[in-house]
A protein has these predicted regions:
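Nucleotide/phosphate-binding sheet-loop regions of phosphoryl- and nucleotidyl-transfer enzymes
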Residues: 361-458
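Amphipathic alpha1 helix at the N-terminus of the CheY-like receiver
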Residues: 18-37, 57, 162-173
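Short mixed-charge
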Residues: 27-39, 176-199, 437-442
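Single conserved hydrophobic/aromatic residue that forms the stacking wall/gate
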Residues: 2-7, 11
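Output/docking surface of receiver
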Residues: 1, 48-50, 72, 95-163, ...
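Terminal, compositionally biased segments used for targeting/anchoring and flexible tails
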Residues: 268-392
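Acidic di-acidic motifs
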Residues: 12-18, 24-27, 51, 158-160, ...
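Conserved phosphotransfer microenvironments
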Residues: 20-28, 32, 42-43, 48-56, ...
Length: 458
């Protein structure tokens, strides 16, 4: 599994561009602070060079995970130099980071960019660098995390360099903040880290064929799709004025419930959003970033789970975690419960919070397959109980009064040693978890008593 524990090479073509990116030389400090604020581990280190020779010298002296090249505003050779470096180090992802200007935009339109992984437009925000690193990591880890763990995907379809350079930092910051919040449900620090790693991956597609290919490959793990309307069908092809609408139509044929968000600068496209049951974001809006966060939160299962009246959409009840959902299941009015289960809202909420086993179990149990509200409540309740028992067994949890109940197993108060007796019970609990044959004894259950240990350091 790839994380940015090694360095990234920032290759800068001109001193002014370096100054513009660094803002008086504090780029490492800014990235470190950004990682710390988002509870991310292993902030990358940057090596800065200003010539092709320096870049090649650095690359030959130590391993690097990423090359970021900045062609200058008046630099006609920057792309050629970047290709020279990429030709020698094909295995290292390369990103082109350009200042925003009409001259650069025009030059990019005439360049063959197929050698590079991504092109970004520098808009003066260090969040973009975090997004670039996370986008590369997500791409590297995608196959493993989806197939082995069940991680979900947010598919962003956008070919406008300036737009996705603005959208991605906003989207990543939102998703990472959400993963921070839901990780607090974890029983201890180790499980918190695992929950944060289970956050949805963001995948960027820039053509119709690329987008539909990603969807077809990972359709069972798509948390939601955010798409532009006008973009090419193939790389370096002519723009199709309705490519995004055709993508929504193709996805809706496969899945009537996956959340779709259409974003466009052409307001008449709002009618297509209604046709395909998609949310709409106006790219011309001054509060586009705010709209995106709100709509993603409402549609992709982030935040609290809100039970609503299906007729008025008025809030009936709100739950913040799995225990609260378990406690309220049988009190939710039948019509509200039916509204949510018939649209896969419960499984999507669980998926977005990295609760993959229970989400995977509940997703295929649709209203069409069961058509019994009370039976559905019971299935969800029993699945939550089983999941909570599984997560609690063999784990030394941090004691929290509002979470400790009949399904809790072993918790500690304080940070010091568990002591001999406490450690012995924790060991036995762990052994029971790893030996399922203990469940085979008829009329006998092998388990430790419910335990709370006062540690030596309170």
């Amino acid at each position: 599994r790839k994380e940015s524990s090694a360095a990234s090479d920032v290759y800068k073509r001109q001193p002014y561009d370096a100054f513009m990116l660094e803002d008086d030389g504090r780029i490492d400090e800014k990235i470190f602070n950004e990682y710390t604020s988002l509870s991310l581990r292993y902030p990358p280190r940057f090596t800065q060079v200003s010539t092709c020779e320096e870049a090649l010298s650095q690359l030959s002296s130590m391993p690097y995970d990423l090359i970021i090249c900045m062609p200058g505003t008046g630099d006609n050779e920057g792309f050629d130099v970047a290709r020279t470096i990429k030709a020698q180090y094909e295995h290292i992802p390369m990103v082109i980071l350009t200042p925003f200007s009409h001259g650069i935009t025009k030059r990019i339109a005439n360049e063959d960019l197929s050698s590079f992984d991504y092109i970004f437009c520098w808009l003066g925000n260090t969040d973009l660098l975090v997004s670039i690193i996370k986008l590369i990591e997500d791409k590297m880890n995608l196959e493993h995390d989806v197939s082995e763990v069940g991680v979900q995907i947010i598919l962003l379809v956008e070919d406008g360099i300036r737009f996705y350079s603005s959208i991605l930092p906003n989207l990543y910051k939102f998703v990472l903040k959400q993963s921070q919040e839901f990780s607090t449900e974890a029983l201890n620090a180790h499980q918190r880290t695992l929950r944060m790693r289970g956050r949805p991956k963001i995948v960027l597609a820039r053509t119709y064929n690329e987008a539909i290919g990603i969807y077809e490959k990972y359709k069972n793990n798509i948390l939601g799709v955010i798409t532009d309307v006008r973009f090419p069908r193939v790389e370096r092809g002519e723009k199709d004025a309705l490519a995004g609408i055709k993508l929504c139509a193709a996805i809706r044929k496969e899945d009537p419930f996956v959340p779709l968000i259409i974003q466009s600068s052409e307001s008449e496209n709002v009618s297509y959003a209604a046709k395909y049951d998609a949310a709409f974001i106006d790219k011309n809006s001054k509060k586009m970033d705010v709209d995106l966060r709100r709509i993603v939160s409402d549609n992709f299962g982030f935040g609290d789970f809100i039970f609503r009246n299906p007729d008025t959409l008025e809030e009936i009840a709100r739950v913040k975690n799995l225990k609260e959902l378990q406690n309220i299941l049988f009190a939710v009015p039948a019509e509200s419960f039916l509204y949510h289960i018939s649209r896969n809202h419960v499984s999507r909420w669980l998926y977005s919070r990295a609760m993959f086993p229970i989400g995977e179990f509940l997703k295929p149990i649709t209203w069409n397959s069961l058509q019994d509200v009370d039976a559905h409540r019971k299935i969800i309740f029993e699945a939550i109980v089983k999941y909570r028992k599984m997560k609690n067994q063999g784990v030394v949890a941090v004691f929290k009064r509002d979470r400790f109940d009949r399904y809790s197993n072993f918790a500690r108060i304080g940070d010091g040693s568990l002591g001999g007796k406490g450690r012995g019970l924790a060991f036995i609990d762990n052994m029971v978890k790893h030996h399922p044959e203990f469940d085979e004894f008829e009329n006998a259950r092998v388990a430790i008593p419910k335990t709370v240990v006062l540690c030596l350091s309170l």
